[in-house]
Swiss-Prot record:
InterPro entries: Complex1_LYR_dom, Complex1_LYR_LYRM7, MZM1/LYRM7. Coiled coil: none annotated. The keyword Mitochondrion applies. Assembly factor required for Rieske Fe-S protein UQCRFS1 incorporation into the cytochrome b-c1 (CIII) complex. Functions as a chaperone, binding to this subunit within the mitochondrial matrix and stabilizing it prior to its translocation and insertion into the late CIII dimeric intermediate within the mitochondrial inner membrane. This is Complex III assembly factor LYRM7. It holds the Pfam family Complex1_LYR. Interacts with UQCRFS1.
Length: 104
């Protein structure tokens, strides 16, 4: 896949993730959109393949962190915050085993 296509794919993926992560939060949606667009415009004249690969790697890492780590919270009262985790972040209870497993 060409470099230009990779850049466009990461750009679109970041915006999709932004829309999913910050759903119903216009302030965060706008701030994230501005930041993504600003960073891509700042580096649009980059020609070094090594630098482009590093920037793509960074963009993928940012997209992964947004998708896997960010949870929305909303102030509903002076001392209350409601968390709105996405279904993709919820995990089933996993049994915890404190005893080391025996090697055979």
């Amino acid at each position: 896949m060409g470099t230009r296509l990779k850049v466009l794919r990461v750009f679109k993926d970041l915006h999709r993730t932004r829309r999913d992560v910050f759903r119903d939060d216009n302030r965060a949606l706008t701030a994230a959109r501005v930041k993504i667009n600003e960073e891509f415009k700042k580096n649009k004249n980059e020609t070094s393949d090594d630098n482009i690969k590093e920037m793509l790697k960074m963009a993928r890492a940012v997209e992964t962190i947004l998708r896997e780590s960010v949870i929305q919270a909303e102030h509903v009262d002076e001392n209350k915050i409601v968390l709105r985790p996405r279904k993709s972040l919820l995990l089933e209870n996993v049994p915890y085993c404190d005893a080391p497993s025996k090697k055979t």
